A protein has these predicted regions:
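A glycine-rich, hydrophobic loop/mini-helix early in the fold
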Residues: 26-74
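Generic signature of intrinsically disordered, low-complexity segments enriched in small/polar residues
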Residues: 10, 14, 35-36, 60, ...
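Amphipathic alpha-helical segments within well-ordered protein domains
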Residues: 8, 12, 57, 61, ...
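Divalent metal-dependent catalytic cores for phosphoryl transfer on phosphate-bearing substrates
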Residues: 39-41, 51, 68-187
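Generic detector of short, locally flexible boundary/turn motifs and exposed helical patches
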Residues: 21-23, 44-46, 106-110
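Non-catalytic interface/linker regions that flank or bridge core catalytic/transmembrane domains
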Residues: 1-35
């Protein structure tokens, strides 16, 4: 099964709320399944975004088991936050070129560049994009909003929202840990 097929299977099996079908149709018409997860770091290759999304989802399932919280959240909620936390990266990257030196010779190398047509912020954009298709509950919003943890620009600027969210919503902390585990251990 390809990553795209696996993603669609998990999505259809778990995400059944109104608007989910329209969201999946939109994803299939977008670059979600071929987009990279980043320009230079984890998953910076074609299909990296869907691979990362699947890995975060799988890590989240494991984290929920580890702390015995699996029954606190529905399969749908876990699938939404795990698979779709980075939906903001859809239609976000374009291919470009950069000059790099290889063996003492300058060569032109194809790279991914950012083209942000909706510069509202990473996690905020994911929440907004998802809510254009379906209603999210508070825990889903908290988890997606806080999934960047201390890498979030608002936190770096001194905002204390993370402490409040992590204290109120264990799912948010577990999604953040799953994102970090996927990024730094598995990818």
């Amino acid at each position: 099964m390809t990553p795209k097929e696996e993603f669609i299977s998990i999505f259809k099996e778990n995400i059944t709320r109104p608007g989910g079908d329209k969201l999946l149709h939109w994803l299939e018409g977008s670059d979600f399944f071929i987009a990279p997860a980043s320009t230079r770091f984890h998953g910076n290759h074609e299909g990296g975004l869907v691979e990362h999304s699947l890995q975060v989802y799988k890590c989240l399932l494991g984290e929920l088991d580890t702390v015995d919280l699996k029954t606190r959240y529905t399969n749908e909620t876990v699938a939404i936050v795990g698979l779709l936390h980075d939906i903001c990266k859809t239609n976000f990257y374009v291919k470009g070129f950069r000059n790099v030196k290889e063996n003492g010779v300058w060569v032109q190398k194809e790279v991914y560049e950012i083209k942000d047509n909706f510069p509202i912020g990473h996690a905020e954009k994911s929440v907004i994009m998802l809510q254009n298709f379906m209603k999210l509950d508070a825990d889903e919003i908290y988890a997606i909003r806080a999934h960047m943890g201390a890498f979030d620009c608002a936190f770096k600027g001194g905002d204390q929202f993370l402490n409040n969210i992590f204290n109120q919503c264990p799912l948010a902390l577990l999604l953040h840990l799953s994102d970090m585990k996927a990024t730094y251990i598995y990818e």
